[in-house]
Amino acid sequence: MISGGKLTGLRDISSVSIRIPRQSTNCGGEVLKKLCAAKDNVLIISPPGGGKTTFLRECIRAISSSGVRVAVCDERGELAAVFRGVPQFDIGPMSVVMTDIPKSEAALMLLRSMNPQVIAMDEISSPEDCRAAASAVGCGVRVIATAHAAAVSDLKRRNVYRFLLAQDVFNNIVVIENNAGVRSYRLETLQ
């Protein structure tokens, strides 16, 4: 149901999906090692359900464990699963989390107040999210984010991501593919 342009409720529900996130350490293999060693901005892509959030969480943990300050924009609580102020997932010792706040606002607040070296954002999908990522990069902060796409060509077809590509916000793209139930991770460099 929509009231005043906002979703206010649901009715005639035919199904419910309950997503149960889990920690998966060391996923991504060599690609994860390259991302931890590099200082580049990275966009992680795959279709829905492809493992983007799980891989991003592992990137956060690995980078933070190396002594780098990571600010996590966890709008829906999927990255850190914060409960009473404590992350329920291991996101590393140098991570701070802002949860239940729109990513675009959280990124700018974290940028101003937490002195991050890296900002992590899951499922950037709006012009505001893209502008926040570009602002962070413009301030010298590394950004690692996820987006729904099967390939770079998909990003180029969508207006919201064309801005990021035109502004050279991301240097690298990690493409996650699922072949017969086995995930593979490929790192592509943007020119």
Model-found features: residue ranges?
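Hydrophobic anchor at the beta1->P-loop junction of P-loop NTPases
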Residues: 44
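Conserved P-loop NTPase nucleotide-binding/switch module
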Residues: 114-174, 178
